[in-house]
From Swiss-Prot:
EC number: 2.8.1.6
Pathway: Cofactor biosynthesis; biotin biosynthesis; biotin from 7,8-diaminononanoate: step 2/2
HAMAP family found in the cross-reference section: BioB
Pfam families: BATS, Radical_SAM
Protein name as it appears in the record: Biotin synthase
Cofactor note text: Binds 1 [4Fe-4S] cluster. The cluster is coordinated with 3 cysteines and an exchangeable S-adenosyl-L-methionine. Binds 1 [2Fe-2S] cluster. The cluster is coordinated with 3 cysteines and 1 arginine.
SUPFAM superfamilies: Radical SAM enzymes
Binding-site residues for [2Fe-2S] cluster, renumbered to this chain: C110, C143, C203, R273
PANTHER family: BIOTIN SYNTHASE (PTHR22976), BIOTIN SYNTHASE, MITOCHONDRIAL (PTHR22976:SF2)
Length: 331
């Protein structure tokens, strides 16, 4: 049986694996986890510097009152959740967020807005903040996550100095209607294609534990491969009280490791980022996940606190991994 995993590794390294082989990884017995992690880490080493690891950070730049009904989200206006609701913060606070990111070692900083799409006025304010970050020579790459913004706005953000846009597909096209009804999966897909047309780097991720099947997970992994996205944030559902998914059962850590491995075997040259829910889901297996990935989101999430940054520092130190410097990322 072990030879099958080595054969899949060789196929992934030299060509591409099939959906059946991807499902084989997900359905593997738990006793093969050490071998799966080893081969996945080995595959990562073929395309990346195995000793380098990146931190990224975000700011909840506009919070709550979102018009969309994403069943996993605390910021939807459809659910009564205990979050702060506010409009886009001012330029000074956006700049301060970049400085905080640098202070705890982040190389990328994403300004995230709750809404279906940022308004023209909001895009202008984001541009002003990015220009100020550049003017102050703050050594961090700036990313934006602002919904289904159009090509014209994307070009403005690029001109201001934004290097990457985040827009998540979240789950497979087949399962998406079970999670969101106020917009379509294809609308999100079109946004990613517009990001690529604008010549910006693409960051598009997934949330696991929404109720999707292994087949849904594999389907989305192949979509990202076909798109050629640069970075894939891997999130694990953190059930939020008063949302439709509040009672969803958390994923097992070992299943999460298999999912990460499967995404790496399909998207071998994409950056894989450990993001929301990593603390609760991975637990003591955090280090194994880090060996298979390139980066993690540090310093907290949109409406939830993250892991103590000192624990992430210690984890990388124990694994003999080096954080990417700002100069290596801000090219």
């Amino acid at each position: 049986m072990e030879q099958v995993f080595f054969d899949i590794y060789q196929k992934a390294k030299n060509d591409e694996i099939s959906k059946e082989e991807a499902l084989f990884i997900l359905k593997a017995e738990d006793k093969y986890i050490p071998l799966i992690v080893y081969l996945t880490s080995k595959l990562k080493d073929e395309f990346f510097d195995s000793q380098k690891f990146e931190f990224c950070s975000i700011i909840n730049a506009k919070s709550g009152a979102c018009s969309e009904d994403c069943k996993f989200c605390a910021q939807s206006k459809f659910y009564k959740t205990p979050i702060n609701i506010y409009k886009l913060v001012d330029k000074e606070e956006l700049v301060e967020g970049a400085i905080r990111g640098v202070e705890f070692g982040a190389n990328r900083y994403c300004m995230v807005l709750s809404s279906r799409a940022a308004s023209d006025e909001e895009v202008e304010k984001l541009c002003e903040a990015v220009q100020e970050i550049k003017a102050q020579n703050i050594p961090i790459n700036v990313c934006v996550s602002a919904g289904t913004i159009g090509l014209e706005s994307l070009l403005k953000l690029k001109e201001a100095g934004v290097t990457r846009i985040n827009h998540n597909l979240e789950t497979s096209e087949n399962y998406f209607p079970n999670i969101v009804s106020t917009h379509t999966w294809k609308e999100r897909l079109e946004t990613i294609k517009n990001v690529q047309k604008a010549g910006l780097s693409t960051c598009s991720g997934v949330i696991f534990g929404l109720g999707e099947t292994d087949e849904d997970r594999v389907d989305l992994a192949f979509v990202y491969k076909e798109l050629g996205v640069d970075s894939i944030p891997l999130n694990f559902l953190m059930p939020i009280p008063n949302t439709p998914l509040e009672n969803n059962k958390p994923l097992r850590a070992l299943d999460a490791l298999k999912i990460i491995a499967m995404f790496r075997f399909i998207n071998k040259s994409a950056e894989l980022r450990l993001c929301g829910g990593r603390e609760q889901t991975l637990g003591d297996f955090h280090g194994m996940a880090a060996f298979m990935t390139n980066a993690l989101m540090a310093g907290g999430y949109l409406t939830r606190a993250g892991r103590d940054i000192k624990k992430d520092y210690k984890m990388l130190e124990d694994m003999n991994l080096e954080r990417l410097t700002s100069e290596e990322v801000c090219k």
